[in-house]
Amino acid sequence: MSRFMTKRLPVRHDTVAPDGADVRELLRVERGNMAHFELAPGQISVAEAHHTVDEIWYFVRGRGEMWRKLGDQEEVVPVDPGVCITIPVGTHFQWRSFGYEPLAAIGVDMPPWPGGGEAYSVDGKWEPTVESGPG
C-alpha cells in the first residue's frame, strides 16, 4: 500500500467550520492536515481561537479582511489571492468577505485538526453573519 496520497478539491463542502466557513477537507498526515475554507460574498465569520492548533492560511480567491489578536498585539489585514498569514495557537481571529465572489483560503493545521472542542468562540471585531458549525 502506498504512503503517497492525492486528492482533488471536492466540488461540495464536507462540513461547516466552527467559524461558519464552508470546509473542503484535503489531505492529512501524522503532523498536519490541509483544508480549503470559503466564506460567501459579504459574509462575516464567527470569531474564534484554538486550544492546540497553529494554522497557516494562503488566500486563493476573493478579497476581504482578517482580524487577529493575541495578547496585546492586534491587527486587521487586507486579504486577497497571494496573501499568506499565520494564526498561532490561542489567537483570536475573524475574517470577512468583500465583493461579488467568495473569499477562499487553503489552510494547514499543525498538529492535525483534532475535531470537536478544539475551537472556542471569542468576542470579535465585527458582528458575524454566519452560524457556527460543528467543525
Language-model regions: role of each:
Residues G71-V89:
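Short acidic-glycine-tyrosine-enriched beta hairpin
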Residues M1-H36, V46-A47, G117-G135:
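A short, N-terminal "cap"/entry segment at the start of jelly-roll beta-barrel domains
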Residues A21, G32-M34, I44, D54, ...:
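Intrinsic-disorder/low-complexity, polar/charged segments enriched in Ser/Thr/Lys/Arg/Asp/Glu/Gln
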Residues D80-P81, V89-G116:
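Ligand-binding loop in jelly-roll beta-barrel domains
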Residues E38-A40, H51-M66:
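Short, conserved beta-strand element in jelly-roll/cupin
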Residues R24-R28, F37, S45-H51, R68, ...:
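Short histidine-centered beta-strand/loop micro-motifs
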Residues H36, M66-R68, A105, G115:
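Short hydrophobic/aromatic-rich beta-strand segments that constitute the beta-sheet cores
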Residues I44-V46, E65, V83-I85, V89-W95:
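Histidine-centered metal-chelating micro-motifs
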